[in-house]
Structures are given as C-alpha cells and as structure tokens.
C-alpha cells in the first residue's frame, strides 16, 4: 500500500480523489492540531474491531459522517443530540481544523475524528454498529457497487 494508492476491501490498489490539504493552517489552527486534535483522534486497533462504547461512554447511538468538509453539519448534530456518539471522517486538513476549532470553542464532547481514508475505519467496525451514516457531498459520487460497504456496518432499520 502506498500513500497515493491505498488498498480497497479486496486488497487491490484504489485511487483517492479528494484533497488532503489546501492553504497553510494559520497559527491558531496549528496550535489546535497540536493541543486538541490528538484527544479527538480515533486510533484504530491493529487487531480486532473498534469499541464504540469505550469511545463514547453512555452513548445510546453512533453516527458516522464521511467527508464532513468544514464540519458545520456534524457540529450542529452533535450539539443537538448529546446522547449520540458522532464520528467524523475527513482527510482535508482545512476542514479538520475548522471543526476542531468549533469543537474546542463550543465544548462539544461527543465527537471523535478519523483523519484518514474512511474505508480503513469501516473495516474496523463491527457489523450493525452504526445507527446512521451521513455522506452529504460525496466525491466521487457513490456507485451502486459501494452499497455493500455501508450495509455491513449499519444496524437494521438504520438510514
């Protein structure tokens, strides 16, 4: 596996089309990356699956948002539903910085972040552990063959 060609679920190289960085982070964002982001970042276990209950003690539901951009939707949902554990998966450093800034400023405690390819996260989740997945502005647009990836981790009746 190389950085430019991560592996897909079948172990074959696949292309990544999103940007990982844009303009340079300003001093305040850089400090948030150093001081705040590490506590929010999800570290995947080498073996086994990710324990969402341990990440979010007391949470009744778990929701994943993939490609959250600036994080406006994710932050609003997290503030509106404090009983839910939210995972945001994003690779773009500008979007990550913007959301971390908002999490820090508003004291949002029910959000954890994954800052790599969401596919790596999906394969570490137990089947039927998520109550919903938000994919609001997909790039590239999802294809029918991608459906099996979401169905495996969504609980029955989830949407």
Regions found by a protein language model. Give the residues of each.
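Conserved beta-strand/loop positions that form the S-adenosyl-L-methionine
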Residues: 66, 89
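A short SAM/SAH-binding and catalytic strip from SAM-dependent methyltransferases
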Residues: 130-150
């Amino acid at each position: 596996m190389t950085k430019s060609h991560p592996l897909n679920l079948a172990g074959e190289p696949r292309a990544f089309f999103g940007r990982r960085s844009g303009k340079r982070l300003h001093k305040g964002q850089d400090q948030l990356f150093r001081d705040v982001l590490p506590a929010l970042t999800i570290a995947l276990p080498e073996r086994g699956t990710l324990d969402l209950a341990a990440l979010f003690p007391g949470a009744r539901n778990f929701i994943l948002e993939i490609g959250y951009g600036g994080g406006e939707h994710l932050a609003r949902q997290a503030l509106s539903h404090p009983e839910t554990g939210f995972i945001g998966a994003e690779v773009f450093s500008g979007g990550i910085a913007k959301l971390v800034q908002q999490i820090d400023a508003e004291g949002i405690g029910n959000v954890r972040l994954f800052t790599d390819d969401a596919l790596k996260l999906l394969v570490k989740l137990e089947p039927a552990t998520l109550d919903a997945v938000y994919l609001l502005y997909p790039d590239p647009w999802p294809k029918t063959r991608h459906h099996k990836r979401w169905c495996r981790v969504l609980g029955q009746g989830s949407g």
